[in-house]
Amino acid sequence: MKLTCVVIVAVLLLTACQLITADDSRGTQKHRSLRSTTKVSKAADCIEAGNYCGPTVMKLCCGFCSPYSKICMNYPKN
């Protein structure tokens, strides 16, 4: 019974801390447009499927690099 009360109090305390932190940080992100453009440019900077992706290539594949043929491949669709 004592352990249950301690767990309940701990969960309530952690929930309250998260809510306080979420309210406090609202609207404080600066340079929002700059951050989104860097994410897009990083996502588009990859090797397309069918191209060589060996150890001398500096870019990553958009999908995955086949370990045997060293050719970029798309992920299979389920």
Curated annotation (Swiss-Prot):
Organism domain of life: Eukaryota
Record key words, sorted: Calcium channel impairing toxin, Disulfide bond, Ion channel impairing toxin, Knottin, Neurotoxin, Presynaptic neurotoxin, Secreted, Signal, Toxin, Voltage-gated calcium channel impairing toxin
Gene Ontology cellular-component terms listed: extracellular region; host cell presynaptic membrane
GO molecular function: calcium channel regulator activity; ion channel inhibitor activity; toxin activity
Location (main, coarse): secreted
Keyword Membrane: no
Chain positions listed as propeptide in the UniProt record: 23-42
Cited InterPro entries: Conotoxin (IPR004214), Conotoxin_omega-typ_CS (IPR012321)
Disulfide bridge partners, by residue number: 46-62, 53-65, 61-72
Span of the signal peptide: 1-22
Known tissue expression: Expressed by the venom duct.
Localisation: Secreted
Protein family (similarity comment): Belongs to the conotoxin O1 superfamily.
Domain notes from UniProt: The presence of a 'disulfide through disulfide knot' structurally defines this protein as a knottin. The cysteine framework is VI/VII (C-C-CC-C-C).
The protein's role, per its UniProt record: Omega-conotoxins act at presynaptic membranes, they bind and block voltage-gated calcium channels (Cav).
Name of this chain's protein: Omega-conotoxin-like 2
Lineage of source species: Eukaryota, Metazoa, Spiralia, Lophotrochozoa, Mollusca
